[in-house]
Amino acid sequence: MEKRVVIAVILSIVVLYAFSYMFPPPVANQKEKAGPVAAVQSQPSSAKLSAIDSVPAAATPQAGLAARNIVVDTDLFIAVFSTKGGGLQSFQLKHYKDKAGAVGRDIVLKNESDGDKLSLLSEGKSFGLEPSLVFQSSAKDTKLAGTEKSSIEFTVTSQTGVILKKVYSFSGNGYGINLHQELINTGSSRVEGAISLINYNRLVAETGDGRYEVYGPVTMAGDKVITDKVSDIAKGPKQFDNNVSWSAFADKYFMDAVIAVKNSIASARVAKISDNYVQTNVTSSPLSLNPGQSASMDYRLFYGPKDLDILKAQGSRLEEAIDFGWFSALAKPLLRSIKFFYSYTHNYGLAIIIITIILKVLFFPLTHKSYKSMKEMQKLQPKMVELKEKFKNDRDAMNRAVMDLYKTHKVNPMGGCLPMLVQIPVFFALYKALMFSIELRHAPFVLWITDLSAKDPYYVTPIIMGVTMFIQQKMTPTNMDPIQAKMMLALPVVFTFMFLNFPAGLVLYWLINNILTIAQQAYINKSLPA
C-alpha cells in the first residue's frame, strides 16, 4: 500500500502542478535490509553481585510439581502467569478490541496452552536452570485498580544449588511491568554463565484489517532501531551484541518488549524456529558466583498498544518502534496535534479536518507564490515560442535567449515548483501519522464510517475525492496534445481506484485537501490579473 501512496503523491503533485507550468493555456493568436548488527564488545553488565549473610538452604528442583496459574487483573489488562518457568501464559488488553462495534472482543496478545512456548521463561544452563522447571510461589490471583501496586514472586532451586527468584511488579493503571531476577549460589563451588529470558511469538495470518501489514521483530541495538520482517529471519537467525536497549515483537498496532535496565541485556537473538513461532532470547553478560554470592538484574516489560505517548513513557526510546520513516520529526508533532484536537472534538475525523485546514492556511503564501509564478510564465509563453522557432537549430543559443528572457522579466522558472516541493515532506509525514496511528483504529467519524483505519465500506469518500480531482483539473486549463489530455482525464479515475482500499482517515484528508485546493485556486485565479 505504501508504494501506491508514493506513486499517488508523486503523480498528483508533479502532474497537477507541473503540467500547468509546462503546458500553459493557449495565448490568443498564438499557435524503500537491515542486516545483523556486527558483534562488538558488550556494555558492562548491570548485574549486582553481593555476598549474603546466610545462605538459604538448597531445595530440591521442582520439575515434578504440577504447574498452576496466577492471574493479575488491572484496569488495562489481564495477565496469566504460570509457575512453569515463571513465565507468561496469556495477556489480554481490556481497552482494545479485535473488531469495531459491539461484536469486538478484547485483543489477546498472548495465549499459549503449550507450556513449552510461554514467554519470559528463564534459562541458564550453566546454573542448572531449565525453562521447564516448575517454580514455587505463594502468590494468589491479584486485582488492581488505579494507582494500586502489587507483585508476584516465583522461586526455584536448580540441581547445582542455584536459587532463581523472579519478581514481577505491577501497577493498576500502567502497561509497564518491572521484572527483577536474582540468582543466589547456595552450592559449594563457583558457578559461571549467563541467564536468558526466552520469548515465543506465535505467527498469525493477515486478518484483513491491516494489523499485520507491519509484523516482526524490532530491536534497538547500537543506538539504532532495526526492524525485521518474519521473512527476513526465516533466512537465518539475527544476532545483536551491540548495546541492546530493548527487544520487541510488533505488528502495526501492538507490541511486546523486554527493555534493559542499566545494561541488563548484553545480547539478543531472534530466530524463526518453525512455521508457527519466532523465538527471541535476551541474554545477560557473563556472571560468576562464588558460594554465598548473589547477582541481580532488572528489566522493564511492555505489552500493549503502539501509542506514541504510552511508549514514550516507558523510556529507552521505545516510541521509536513506530516506524514513521524519514519524516519522523514531522510525523510525531502532527500526530500529537491530531490527538490535541481530538481532546476537544472527541472525533478523529474532525481532528483530521482541522489539521488539514491549518496546513492549508500555513502553506497558502507558498501556494499563492507558486500560482503567481506560473501565471508570469504563461505570459512569457508567446515569446518563448518565438525564441524556440528562431533558434530551433541551435539549442545552446536558444537556452541563452530563454534565460535572458527570464532575467529581463525577473521570472524564476522554478518559482512554480519549489513552493510545492516544500509541502511534500509534510504530506508524507501526515500520511505516516495517519497510516500507523493506533488512535484511528476503530475510531468512528460520521454515519457509515465507523473505522477511520479501514476502507470506506461503501466507497463514497474515494468517489467524491475523484470528482474533486476532476474539478481541480478542470480549473487548471492546459495546452496539451490529445494524448496528454487523455492522460489527464484518466488521472482522477486512476486515483479513485487506488484510494478505494485506503484507510478512510487518509482518504478524508486527501478529500478535504482537494476541496480546500479548489477554493484556494478559485480565489487565486480571481485575485491575480489575467
From Swiss-Prot:
Pfam families: 60KD_IMP (PF02096), YidC_periplas (PF14849)
Membrane topology reported for the UniProt record: Multi-pass membrane protein
InterPro entries associated with the record: Membr_insert_YidC, Membr_insert_YidC_N, YidC/ALB3/OXA1/COX18, YidC/Oxa/ALB_C, YidC_ALB_C, YidC_periplasmic_sf
Main location: membrane
Keyword terms, alphabetized: Cell inner membrane, Cell membrane, Chaperone, Membrane, Protein transport, Transmembrane, Transmembrane helix, Transport
PANTHER family (alphabetical): CYTOCHROME C OXIDASE ASSEMBLY PROTEIN COX18, MITOCHONDRIAL (PTHR12428:SF65), OXA1 (PTHR12428)
Record bears the keyword Transmembrane helix: yes
Native source species: Geotalea daltonii (strain DSM 22248 / JCM 15807 / FRC-32) (Geobacter daltonii)
Gene3D superfamilies in UniProt: 2.70.98.90
Compartment list: Cell inner membrane
Family the entry assigns: Belongs to the OXA1/ALB3/YidC family. Type 1 subfamily.
A Gene Ontology molecular function term of the record: membrane insertase activity
UniProt subunit comment: Interacts with the Sec translocase complex via SecD. Specifically interacts with transmembrane segments of nascent integral membrane proteins during membrane integration.
Superkingdom classification of source: Bacteria
Protein name: Membrane protein insertase YidC
Function: Required for the insertion and/or proper folding and/or complex formation of integral membrane proteins into the membrane. Involved in integration of membrane proteins that insert both dependently and independently of the Sec translocase complex, as well as at least some lipoproteins. Aids folding of multispanning membrane proteins.
Keyword Chaperone: yes
Cellular component, GO annotation: plasma membrane
Gene name of the record: yidC
GO biological process: protein insertion into membrane; protein transport
